[in-house]
């Protein structure tokens, strides 16, 4: 093995941690993955053990080295990308978390979010953070931990505790406590950060009674945050020089550098992000305004629509209903369905995300007849993912007065050709599937490599990630609109069913 240099991306996700080593062409040299425990203390609560996450990251770093034969001193820089919003509070001295990490999906702080809404803070939070008040974001999770762990508020006020999203936790661990930092994209998801003024918002901190002393320093997405402590990186002292929340990292990995460019990642959930350039644009239709990335002294904003259930609907077909043995099989069954698409599945298992934001909604099925088959049901579940994406793309076009010409896609479910073709049909636009579907990790690697000169500039990156396949719409307009009208009716009925009885 020659002394070629590489970039390592650490991709810390909701169900597993991965380390991927990339070469100068942006190609994957090796990767390692490790799942970790999902903790469900009560219905609707989701937690992780932050130490177990750290151990899984250590394990995959080793795995990537072993698989490739690359040595720690051949890693030029490390990029980190992470599940966003998930919240850790730990002891500054011992480095031990004082409670489990509360995961982005967890609804345990929903009563706190409702309280803030009822107190009339909706507009204020939206204008400052670009977000809607929801248990999804970190703010109420921090408040919950400080409320439920004995003495935590007092210790936080004394400066004995630290808060971080997963990126912050990993950098703190990798540098052995030398760096307590986060980046623009992760800070923007806490509901504590003023995305216009680019600073922690004192008024929001006061409303929530969260001491400023526990917050990390906010930095750009591409700069050196610190170096690995040799005993945490198998002898290597390597700069950690790129960082972004998973969806923003995918935006960067998809090379969506121009305003108006849009990407969708079909993962557990589905996250559609549009680069809106250097102007912050507040949505009037329940999309989130967030920071895409900050690089070279400039900050690029984004509009985002979050769908909570996408790929996990296919997992539900596999694990919950046992209709398929593996996810790819869903494509075959969908093609074998010969009904007229009259079945609609609304997979609101954890409520409805953008643009509805109805946390009481639950999954429902419409249009069943005696003739409905397993194939029809599977097809309707795949189609539900595409319909939800259309909800958001339509909203984005209204908000920005921009006609979206092409949707760049990545993520596991983007491998499903039936879903991609139906997505093109129901949107009426081209779907460009990335050749390298590792766009999230690649985005983190690009950010890290740029800041140490491994790649020269954005123009060099543009040569690296080509489109793999283009799906063009082939459905006629009236059929498309008829199907989508049925979906809107199904969502409306789902929301009526979810209405809380007086």
UniProtKB/Swiss-Prot annotation:
Sn-glycerol 3-phosphate binds at residues 14, 84-85, 136, 246. Keywords: ATP-binding, Glycerol metabolism, Kinase, Nucleotide-binding, Phosphoprotein, Transferase. The keyword Glycoprotein does not apply. InterPro entries: ATPase_NBD, Carb_kinase_FGGY, Carb_kinase_FGGY_CS, FGGY_C, FGGY_N, Glycerol_kin. GO terms for cellular component: cytosol. Glycerol binds at residues 84-85, 136, 246-247. Activated by phosphorylation and inhibited by fructose 1,6-bisphosphate (FBP). Its EC number is 2.7.1.30. The phosphoenolpyruvate-dependent sugar phosphotransferase system (PTS), including enzyme I, and histidine-containing protein (HPr) are required for the phosphorylation, which leads to the activation of the enzyme. ATP binds at residues 14-16, 268, 311, 315, 412. ADP binds at residues 14, 18, 268, 311, 412, 416. Pfam families: FGGY_C, FGGY_N. CDD domains: FGGY_EcGK_like (cd07786). The modification Phosphohistidine is found at residue 232. Pathway: Polyol metabolism; glycerol degradation via glycerol kinase pathway; sn-glycerol 3-phosphate from glycerol: step 1/1. It comes from the Bacteria. It catalyses: glycerol + ATP = sn-glycerol 3-phosphate + ADP + H(+). GO terms for molecular function: ATP binding; glycerol kinase activity. Homotetramer and homodimer (in equilibrium). PANTHER family: GLYCEROL KINASE, SUGAR KINASE. Key enzyme in the regulation of glycerol uptake and metabolism. Catalyzes the phosphorylation of glycerol to yield sn-glycerol 3-phosphate. Belongs to the FGGY kinase family. This is Glycerol kinase. It comes from Streptococcus pneumoniae (strain ATCC 700669 / Spain 23F-1).
């Amino acid at each position: 093995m020659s002394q070629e240099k590489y970039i390592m991306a650490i991709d810390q996700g909701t169900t597993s941690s991965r380390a991927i080593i990339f070469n100068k062409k942006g190609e994957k040299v090796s990767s390692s993955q490790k799942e970790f425990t999902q903790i469900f203390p009560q219905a609707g609560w989701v937690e992780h053990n932050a130490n177990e996450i750290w151990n899984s990251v250590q394990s995959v770093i080793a795995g990537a080295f072993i698989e490739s034969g690359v040595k720690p001193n051949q890693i030029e820089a490390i990029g980190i990308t992470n599940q966003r919003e998930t919240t850790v509070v730990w002891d500054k001295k011992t480095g031990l978390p004082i409670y489990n990490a509360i995961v982005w999906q967890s609804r345990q702080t929903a009563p706190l979010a409702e309280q803030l809404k009822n107190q009339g803070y909706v507009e204020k939070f939206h204008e400052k953070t670009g977000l809607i008040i929801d248990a999804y974001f970190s703010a109420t999770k921090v408040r919950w931990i400080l409320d439920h762990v004995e003495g935590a508020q007092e210790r936080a006020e004394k400066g004995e505790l630290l808060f971080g999203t997963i990126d912050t936790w990993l950098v703190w661990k990798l540098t052995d406590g030398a760096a307590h930092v986060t980046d623009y994209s992760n800070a923007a998801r806490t509901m504590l950060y003023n995305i216009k003024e680019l600073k922690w918002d004192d008024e929001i901190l006061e409303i929530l009674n969260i001491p400023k002393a526990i917050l990390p320093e906010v930095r750009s997405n591409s700069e050196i945050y610190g170096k690995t402590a040799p005993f945490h990186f198998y002898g290597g002292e390597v700069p950690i020089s790129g960082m972004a929340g998973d969806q923003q990292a995918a935006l960067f990995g998809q090379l969506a550098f121009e305003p108006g460019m849009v990407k969708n990642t079909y993962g557990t959930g589905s996250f559609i992000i549009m680069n809106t350039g250097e102007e912050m644009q507040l949505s009037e239709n329940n999309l989130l305004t967030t920071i895409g990335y900050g690089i070279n002294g400039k900050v690029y904003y984004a509009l985002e629509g979050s769908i909570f259930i996408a790929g996990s609907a296919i997992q539900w077909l596999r694990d919950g209903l046992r209709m398929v043995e593996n996810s790819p099989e869903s494509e075959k069954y969908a093609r074998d369905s010969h009904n007229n698409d009259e079945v609609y599945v609304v997979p609101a298992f954890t409520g409805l995300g953008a643009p509805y934001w109805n946390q009481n909604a639950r999954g429902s099925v419409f249009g069943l007849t005696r003739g409905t088959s397993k194939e029809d049901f599977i097809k309707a579940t795949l189609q539900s993912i595409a319909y939800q994406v259309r909800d958001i793309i339509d909203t984005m076009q209204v908000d920005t007065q921009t006609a979206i010409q092409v949707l760049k896609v990545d993520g596991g479910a983007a491998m499903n050709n039936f879903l991609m073709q139906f997505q093109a049909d129901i949107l009426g636009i081209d779907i460009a599937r990335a050749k390298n579907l590792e766009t999230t990790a690649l985005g983190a690697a690009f950010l890290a490599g740029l800041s140490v000169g491994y790649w020269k500039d954005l123009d060099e990156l543009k040569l690296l990630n080509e489109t793999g396949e283009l799906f063009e719409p082939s459905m006629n307009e009236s059929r498309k609109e008829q199907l989508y009208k049925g979906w809107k009716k199904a969502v409306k009925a789902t929301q009526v069913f979810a209405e809380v009885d007086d």
